[in-house]
Regions:
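Arg/Lys-rich amphipathic alpha helix in sigma70-family domain 2
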Residues: 59-66, 76-97, 116
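Conserved RNAP core-binding helix
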Residues: 9, 25, 33, 41-60, ...
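Structural recognition of an alpha-helix C-terminal capping motif at a helix-to-coil junction
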Residues: 34, 48-55, 68-80
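C-terminal edge and immediately downstream basic/flexible tail or linker adjoining helix-turn-helix-like DNA-binding
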Residues: 2-3, 12, 41, 93-96, ...
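Sigma70-family region 2
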Residues: 14-15, 41-42, 51-69, 88-90
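Helix-turn-helix DNA-binding module
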Residues: 128-136, 140, 144-164
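Internal acidic/polar
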Residues: 2-6, 84, 92-116, 120
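N-terminal module of bacterial RNA polymerase sigma factors
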Residues: 1-31, 38, 128, 149-150, ...
Length: 183
């Protein structure tokens, strides 16, 4: 059903139907932002990546060729822009990790917030230490809820390779996180 809706949206986009762009944005904005945050670990940069993807989509809609799903196309666009950002910032890799918001509850005490904040910083630092291929697979699987088959298509790799990258990435994250809490 989603594929059918996406094909209809693409058809409408190519014919200049403005509400179709609004629907694509509403449908995929949160997923793409969550994915971009996991890949670039900076909220402002992630928002820029997602905005660039939608601006690029709007500017190139007349030449748009989506081989698979619109979701896959947009995810691949976010991946490409995040990779470009990493390459552009290769010299400045020592920035601060993103801190995600603590879930809003009335009972968030300062000591719990500090603990949550510290754990998130350590997790982001551990993610930063993963090889790019492993970090990408872990992020796509856990944050964007993509299957290994979908990730394999996006990375042009075999499913076994993607599963291995995921497994090794989780093992390394576990080791890095445990070493922090033991020290």
């Amino acid at each position: 059903m989603a594929m059918l809706e996406d094909r209809l949206l693409i058809w409408r986009l190519k014919r200049g139907h403005e509400p179709a762009m609004a629907r694509v944005y509403a449908k995929y904005k949160n997923l793409l932002l969550k994915l971009a945050c996991g890949l670039v670990r900076d909220t402002a940069a992630a928002e820029d990546v997602v905005q660039d993807v939608f601006v690029g989509l709007a500017e190139s809609v007349d030449r748009l060729k989506v081989g698979g799903s619109l979701k896959g196309y947009l995810i691949q666009s976010v991946l490409n822009r995040a990779r470009n950002l990493h390459r552009a910032n290769a010299v400045r890799r020592n920035g601060n990790p993103v801190t995600e918001d603590v879930p809003a509850t009335e009972e968030v005490r300062p000591d719990r917030w500090v603990l949550h904040h510290d754990q998130l910083q350590h997790l982001h630092e551990a993610l930063r230490q993963l090889p790019p291929e492993q970090r990408e697979v872990v992020t796509l699987h856990l944050r964007a809820d993509l299957t290994f088959r979908e990730i394999a298509r996006l990375q042009n790799a075999s499913i076994n390779t993607v599963q291995s990258r995921y497994r090794y990435g989780l093992e390394k994250l576990r080791t890095l996180m445990n070493s922090e809490f033991e020290s």
